Amino acid sequence: MGAHAIVTDANISSSLENNTTGITAFSMPGWQLALWATAYLVLVLVAVTGNATVIWIILAHQRMRTVTNYFIVNLALADLCMAAFNAAFNFVYASHNIWYFGRAFCHFQNLFPITAMFVSIYSMTAIAADRYVAIVHPFQPRLSAPGTRAVIAGIWLLALALAFPQCFYSTITMDQGATKCVVVWPEDNGSKMLLLYHLVVIALIYVLPLLVMLLAYSVIGLTLWRREVPRHQVHGASLRHLRAKKKFVKTMVLVVVTFAICWLPYHFYFILGSFQEDIYYHKFIQQVYLALFWLAMSSTMYNPIIYCCLNHRFRSGFRLAFRCCPWVTPTEEDKIELTHTPSLSARINRCHTKETFFMAGETALSPATNGQARGPQDGLPDEP
């Protein structure tokens, strides 16, 4: 995360300073800086626009307000904030090796990246747990609306608690006329505390939740692919329901795998640096770090693209959101897809199914349901 980058870059930067004030061993040619700036600008624009659109699609349409989709909103909000408040500012710091943004933002920058990443991955974990209950144990009670809000609030509180130590020990220092945002651990065991903190953070916001999701989606996959549709229903709603659930599993597995791939090199970078600090003294490490940081931050922009490509309701939502663009032409079906309420006959035909489905397949939470999620959304389409 960006906060880790600040710790490392700031703590080692003074040893890389040249004798000339304002010039560091990390200085790069203007054309190279322009290329990196363009890459990061594209990342931030795509991530902020895409995740803001996902949030709008869900919150602006009653049919999309489901347990799973509220966790999707939480994930999108964390990714949006990560791109807006971490990617851009940390790029400026890493490329110039000077902190321009003041003491208060130094504390924030050492608090928020860990918080946002924790919220992102545990929102994915909550989705996996919710789908596990819905598919593997379909007759067990689902999360209520208050329960969903409580889980989301709990995720944010735990995330802030995990990030607090780094925020607490962050400070502003001056090094040969250059301002640095650094994390100063207690002097007695500073290096040991830094290593321990890195390992704990990586375990809690990467290894543990990925293992939980691997187990959950493995069980979900086995359950779905072993399930058979009765012969007399091979062309009916049951087959569509099964296909929708399988497509959901593929979608969320793609989201999780993308996240894991984007962040793995970045975490490995800091684990290696904790044991071999001399790697930070090489001039090329700035380019390595900028590449790894871009890859990690790029995880914030892929989810909206995945939703749009694999989920037809989100495709409809994106068409409506960008209808002002000359190359985007939303249809009446796109509007119906997000607002249509099926007929009573369709409800009766589907009321026997207890399970709920990703994005399109759940009943939207409302006061009328007394806060308890019910069965499947009426009018479940062929895909989730």
UniProtKB/Swiss-Prot annotation:
Q: Where in the cell is it found?
A: Cell membrane
Q: Which InterPro entries match?
A: GPCR_Rhodpsn, GPCR_Rhodpsn_7TM, Neurokn_rcpt, NK2_rcpt
Please, one GO biological process term? positive regulation of flagellated sperm motility
- Cite a single Pfam family from the UniProt record: 7tm_1
**Which intervals lie on the Extracellular side per UniProt?**
1-32, 91-107, 171-196, 273-290
| Segments on the Cytoplasmic face | 57-69, 130-149, 219-251, 311-384
GO CC annotation? plasma membrane; sperm head; sperm midpiece
Write out the GO MF terms. Answer: substance K receptor activity
Name of the protein described by the UniProt record? Substance-K receptor
Q: Which gene encodes it?
A: TACR2
